[in-house]
Amino acid sequence: MPLLEVEGVRRSFGGLVAVDRVAFKVAAGQIKAVIGPNGAGKTTLFNIISGLLKPDAGRITFKERSITGFSPHQIARAGLSRTFQNPSLFVQMNVLENVMVGRHHRTRCGFARCALRFPGQMTEERAIRAAALQHLAFAGLAHLAEFPSGALAFGQRRMVELARALATEPELLLLDEPASGLNTKEKMDLGNLIRRIRDRGTTILLVEHDMSLVMDLSDDILVLNSGVPIAEGPPRVVQSDPKVISVYLGGDLKEDASGGELSAKWIQTP
């Protein structure tokens, strides 16, 4: 059985259909990418899966249990976590405290009660801190633990948000354009981290415009266009699909893939 199954999901905003009849599966241990031009419905799909939006129709199953219409908190509790296009950290907290917030989803006391530091909860708070430090170290951020979040560079904020998502110990991690705004070295580091996350047992579903990264990381790719799936399969199959080539190369696209547009260079990637 797949870890995640999306069946016939549809969502509209007024007269605009954002996603329509979207169906796909994500196997446990897989890195699956969702790609498509701007406005294809990728982030809307992520928002539906993670509970920020409710679908007009369709069903979402996670670990053989329907999570359709669940709140974001319920979905996080079920074992699914996500990051966003624009990192959203608590700027009044340091890096470690931000990651500890994510870890509180896996505790009995929760963030607010632990923050009150009642005697019976101090032991759990120490365990939360230790676990958060481990996730920072895994992401290569241990040296920034006490650093103010508001003073971080953009790429560092992205990595802290990823560490915070990992602190929830998800079985499925959704990454929404994780490479956006990163330089070449940061993208390389991100790719290595995503592989390590998968290698330790976390399944990954990502939306990304950097096609070099997508082709390098993904086991399977779903392509959306105007909210509708047009292709699905391994990278080599998707690269050569006539519908995908038509969508991305139908006009006179000259930009490099790292700029958010697919190019002939990508289509010809060996």
Language-model features: locations:
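Glycine-rich phosphate-binding loops of nucleotide-dependent enzymes
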Residues: 1-270
